Curated annotation (Swiss-Prot), chain B:
Gene expressing this chain: kdelr1-b
Protein species of origin: Xenopus laevis
Interaction with the K-D-E-L motif on target proteins as annotated region, ranges: 47-48, 159-169
Superkingdom, taxonomy of origin: Eukaryota
Membrane side Lumenal: residue ranges: 1-4, 53-58, 111-116, 169-178
UniProt xrefs under Pfam families: ER_lumen_recept
Main location: Golgi
Keywords per UniProt: Cytoplasmic vesicle, Endoplasmic reticulum, ER-Golgi transport, Golgi apparatus, Membrane, Protein transport, Receptor, Transmembrane, Transmembrane helix, Transport
Family per similarity comment: Belongs to the ERD2 family.
GO cellular component, one term: Golgi membrane
Protein name: ER lumen protein-retaining receptor 1-B
Site entry (Interaction with the K-D-E-L motif on target proteins), positions: 5, 117
Length: 10, 212
């Protein structure tokens, strides 16, 4: 399951 | 935060500042694609809607504010303040061919079917192709000012560094976001031709000229 990690990124 | 992401953000910020200063100091937006800048303004607007609802860090919030403000300032300078110097005849890329497919794709491929998530996904997809009008304009005019090529290089390197950031985060944080990674790969690949020209020409003091 891909974690939506990119939300804390610009 | 890791060194790759930090350097990527610095590179992105410097690209934005380089462009702002180039237009403001030279009082001209010759050679700059207004369409790409419009797309970037849309990218930041749709990506940072959670600016006031989701506080991550002072750094994150302040960078988002700077990105949004500077992208609107750049669009304003191109289409209003210095519109006499805007080279509309060479800025002819059909942006609807970028906006419509990415909008449709963001509805089909996303992590969560909610408005904020779909808009975030749309901004990720749109950013990966937002530079095309600018690259198209450079190929049409056959050359670019040196300052513009530095802008493009910094802008291209930022997402390349983010690719390393995602490798780092996969390795050490067990985190990955396939949508951001795939779009980031597409975005970086689109710059390859330009990177080659930049490294072989501009860094040798020559002017950037594309085979028209």
């Amino acid at each position: 399951e891909a974690n939506t990690a990119a939300k804390d990124e610009l | 935060m890791n060194i790759f992401r930090f350097l990527g953000d610095i590179s992105h910020l410097s690209a934005i500042i380089i462009l702002l200063l180039k237009i403001w100091k030279s009082r001209s937006c010759a050679g700059i694609s207004g369409k790409s800048q419009l797309l970037f303004a849309i990218v930041f607007t749709t990506r940072y809607l959670d600016l006031f609802t989701n506080f991550i860090s002072f750094y994150n919030t302040s960078m988002k504010v700077v990105y949004v403000a500077s992208s609107y300032a750049t669009v304003w300078m191109i289409y209003s303040k210095f519109k006499a110097t805007y080279d509309g005849n060479h800025d002819t890329f059909r942006v609807e061919f970028l906006i419509v497919p990415t909008a449709i794709l963001s509805f089909l491929v996303n992590h969560d079917f909610t408005p904020l998530e779909i808009l975030w996904t749309f901004s990720i997809y749109l950013e990966s192709v937002a530079i095309l009008p600018q690259l198209f304009m450079v190929s049409k005019t056959g050359e670019a000012e040196t300052i513009t090529s530095h802008y493009l290089f910094a802008l291209g390197i930022y997402r390349t560094l983010y690719l390393f950031n995602w490798i780092w985060r996969y390795q050490f944080e067990e985190f990955f976001d396939l949508i951001a990674i795939v779009a980031g790969l597409v975005q970086t690949v689109l710059y390859c031709d330009f990177f080659y020209l930049y490294i072989t020409k501009v860094l040798k003091g020559k002017k950037l000229s594309l085979p028209a």
